[in-house]
Amino acid sequence: MASSAVQICSNALLLLGDKPINSFDEGYDRALLCSNLWDNARQAVLRAHPWNCAKARVSLAPETETPAFDWSYQFALPGNCLRVLFVGETGVPEDYTIEGRRILADVNPLYLSYIYDNEDVASWDALLIETMQRYMAFSMAYPLTKSATLRDSMYQEYANLLKSAKAVDGQEEPPETVGDSPFIDVRR
C-alpha cells in the first residue's frame, strides 16, 4: 500500500502507462506535474467525502469583532478546515452561516466537527489511497497523454472507486440516532 504522496503519484503514473517517480524533485516533467497537482488534488478528494481519517472536532472561542447584524458571534475556521460537517454538540445542530473563512452563529463557544487537510498519507484508509491514485491519474491523464478518452476513463474509474469507498467508509460509522429535542419529546 502506498504510504507517501510520491508513491500515490507513482502508482497513478503507472495507471497511465508511464514510468514511476522517486521524488517530486527529480526534474522530470511528470514529477513536476505530480508536485504541482498534489495539494489541490488531495484537498479535493478529502472534501469529497467525510473520510474517518480526516475528521476533527474543536471548540472555538469567538473573535473580538462581532458581525454587523443577524448573528451575535463570529468564529475563525481552523486553518486546516476543508469542509464543515456539523456545528453543535450532542447531536443538536446549531444555526449558523459561513462567510469566507468565518462561521457566524449565536452560540458561545461553538462546537465544530469538520474535515481537515490530512497530509499524513500513512494514516489514510486503503480505499482513500486507491481513490487518490485514480484522481491523480485522472488529473494527469490529459497533460501527459493528450488523450481525452484516457482522461474520461480515469475519471470514471475515480468516480466508481469513490462511490465504493464512501460505502465502506460510511459503514464504519454507528447508525445515526435521533437526539434529544423538544419536538421528539412531545411525540413520546
Residue spans of the language-model regions?
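Short, extreme N-terminal leader segments that mark the start of a protein/domain
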Residues: M1-N36
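Internal mixed-charge
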Residues: A2, Q7-I8, T90-R188
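Hydrophobic/aromatic-lined pockets within catalytic cores
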Residues: L13-I21, R42, L46, P50, ...
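Generic, ordered loop/turn and secondary-structure boundary motif
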Residues: N22-D25, N52-A54, S59, I184
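N-terminal start-of-chain detector that recognizes signal peptides
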Residues: F24-E26, R83-F86, P109
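Short secondary-structure subsegments characteristic of cysteine-rich extracellular domains
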Residues: E26-V45, L150-K166
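Divalent metal-cofactor coordination and adjacent catalytic microenvironments
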Residues: L32-R102, W124-M140, L144
